[in-house]
Amino acid sequence: MGTALKLTQTLVLRDPDNAGHAARVTELALRLAAAMDVSPSRVKAIKAGGQLHDIGKLELDRAILDKPGALDPDELEEIRTHPELGARMLHGIRSLRAALNCVLHHHERWDGGGYPYGLGGEAIPLEARILAVADAYDAMTSLRPYRGARTREEALAEVERCAGSQFDPRIARVFLSL
């Protein structure tokens, strides 16, 4: 995992707030994977994917990432490129191949309304579906430049509300039981 650590450190240097986010997402996703009795190979992918899921943001304009208000359509489109940018960054690194699907698909939605490919249901790799719940929960409970943090209860209610649309309903149920 030396390469993953170096890439994570690079991201942290550019975006210190992301350090805590990546660590929290990884921890939540690993707890969720353990509760679901996920195989060791998938756990390894989730660990690396959690650390690196936003690595593509290294390629984005810092002003967009730090913008305090709503993003305009062009800025939103640029943000939505980060999964593919991250996957391209990892593509040639053999030791991080397991993380590739997590990085590429963590913004796909159970109902097919996500990005970058609009995958839905079981077409989304399990590791990415697990990370999606952990990532969204941490995003909701963290202070962002454009909004305040939600309470734990508010975020859990949102995960429950989005089960079957944004999130795999089985994974959401397990997450809510943690």
Q: Which residues does each predicted region cover?
A:
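Metal-dependent catalytic cores of enzymes that make or break cyclic nucleotides
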Residues: 4-178
